[in-house]
Amino acid sequence: MKQTSLALAITALLSTLPSALVQANEGCAPLTGKESGMDIGRSSTERCLPGANPLQDQQWYLLNSGQDGFSARGGIAGNDLNLWWAHRTGVLGQGVNVAVVDDGLAIAHPDLADNVRPGSKNVVTGSDDPTPTDPDTAHGTSVSGIIAAVDNAIGTKGIAPRAQLQGFNLLDDNSQQLQKDWLYALGDSNASRDNRVFNQSYGMSVVDPRSANSLDQSQLDRLFEQQTLKAQGAAYIKAAGNGFNKIAAGGYVLNRTGNGPKLPFENSNLDPSNSNFWNLVVSALNADGVRSSYSSVGSNIFLSATGGEYGTDTPAMVTTDLPGCDMGYNRTDDPSTNRLHGNSQLDASCDYNGVMNGTSSATPSTSGAMALLMSAYPDLSVRDLRDLLARSATRVDAKHQPVMVSYTSSTGKVRDVKGLEGWERNAAGMWFSPTYGFGLIDVNKALELAANHQPLPPLVQLPWQKINVTGSAAAIADVGNSPTSSTTRIATPLTVEAVQVMVSLDHQRLPDLLIELVSPAGTRSILLSPFNSLVGQSLDQQQLGFVRTKGLRDMRMLSNKFYGESAQGTWRLEVTDVANGTRQVSLLNRETRERTTLTERNNRQPGKLISWSLRVLGHDANRS
């Protein structure tokens, strides 16, 4: 059964709102959603944003006109979430509850208070007020403003300015981060269960591989599955990570030195929670319409969203801050060159900041966009909403090219292989990039597609299919002439929504490895790019406190690249060792500021592929 037409959905929404709630600048009047033939794209002559909020004109993520966000220069017009038509037609996130699981939420902030609903929790004190007392704990408050700052002519405007917020301060420095508190905040409590969006602007950086089979991770996976698949289910939005160039781990900041291929140091698949199908993982885009310099990437990326840069040379995100000039990112003594900061005339109370960034900003950008879609189409499943966002996304940075890795094999043959793909089209016609996922969110287009959307058939989760690899077929040659490969066959006629892989192998220098999955249609997806942050084997265990590992043990990775393809047929895993030279990693001690250099020496013996497992999630191909 088709959904109600968009015009009817918007008319119904407008009928519930007092006209004063849609504040309009002169020349940006409300629309009915019934206007015939209107261009609702990023270059439309009708493009404008309602609202009289004094900082709104610098919120490029709402409507990018090339403004500078109080930095040295502006971005390129049009690189935004394209939500102006949604706002002009009254789609504002009404009726949608959003949980911000972060370091806190200033619930009395003048630009947030009217959108904060009961049910927040301070896991440190046990109270229902997660307002931070530490002046450096402003992250969650800034995240909240991006999602749902009130359209009240005070400061900024949220992406979904009528959505309702709860805050849970799991990331507070004094939080013990107990599993029971994570479960409580993420939907396993009466207080949080009715949230339709869970914003997770956090992640994990690792130097040694982590298994996704821990009890804690398994509990969260089951909870996310239950909450996602229920009627009017919940969307879990997750940050990809900020480790493209460097990571923080074990008291150190690590980055690779030298002039090697421009590959991510932190592949987003290295965080076990990022290979969870139920998490919609997001990379960050800047105001110029390309990957934010810090953003982690990988085959698990579903979408890209606005995250910005650092707010000095080029725009970050203008949003709410802890109130007061002695709290948060914006303080009287703030050394930032962002013009909003330091007791500026525009923000004399220092209640806002112009330096919020990271995939921590791309995540609430996505949460806000999801809230807008849920507001207009409350009965669509989360899987349907994900499908709409994927099919409507914009292929930004269209000339984005693959990163090539060249090496000389053990027999003297020069091999050129892809270390990371650019934009590629899969066998189902879907464009995908591990940098941008399916592309930049386009709210207006997603709403337009929703009017005639056919709901997806029920989700089918095939059981894990394990393949043991033995004998000579298991050997991973040092800079081999060809990859080590293993195959398995799926007989079920399934249309793919995502594919998960778990890999176990032995190898003495894991960052040498390129791991790829090839579908029955021949589409290739790089699950793990080489020269990554898995440098724990090379670290001095006693000096730095890292634990050595023999290799990967059931390390889970996810790919969205096969979306819409047929699962039926032969799947192939390929593992290639692409390097044998000596490399170096720089380590900065975060406490002493002492810098040392780590030498990564080549493996002394070939690696070994022990086993791998495959799971496909999708729906009945005969009902697509």
Swiss-Prot record:
Residues covered by region (Disordered): 116-140
Positions that bind Ca(2+) 2: 321-322, 324, 327, 330, 350
Residue stretches in coiled coil: none
Ranges of residues in domain P/Homo B: 456-622
Listed GO biological process terms: protein processing
Activity regulation text: Folding, maturation and production of the active form of the protease by the cell requires a protein (ORF2), encoded just downstream of asp, which acts as a chaperone. Formation of a complex with ORF2 in the periplasm also inactivates the protease activity and likely protects ASP from intrinsic proteases. In vitro, protease activity is inhibited by human alpha-2-macroglobulin, suggesting that this inhibitor can impede ASP virulence activities in A.sobria infection sites. However, slow ASP inhibition by alpha-2-macroglobulin in plasma may indicate insufficient ASP control in vivo.
Residues binding Ca(2+) 3: 478, 512, 577, 579, 602-603
Peptidase S8 domain span: 59-421
SS bond partners: 28-48, 325-350
Active site: 102, 139, 360
Keyword field contains Metal-binding: yes
Needed co-factor(s): Ca(2+)
PROSITE patterns listed in its UniProt record: P_HOMO_B, SUBTILASE, SUBTILASE_ASP, SUBTILASE_HIS, SUBTILASE_SER
Reported consequences of knocking out the gene: Disruption mutant releases negligible serine protease activity and does not affect plasma clotting.
Top-level lineage group: Bacteria
Family membership: Belongs to the peptidase S8 family. Furin subfamily.
Subunit details: Forms a complex with the chaperone ORF2 in the periplasm. After translocation of the ASP-ORF2 complex from the periplasm to the extracellular space, the complex is dissociated in a pH-dependent manner.
Domain characteristics, as noted in the entry: Contains an N-terminal subtilisin domain and a C-terminal P-domain.
Name of the featured protein: Aeromonas extracellular serine protease
Protein source organism: Aeromonas sobria
Gene this chain is encoded by: asp
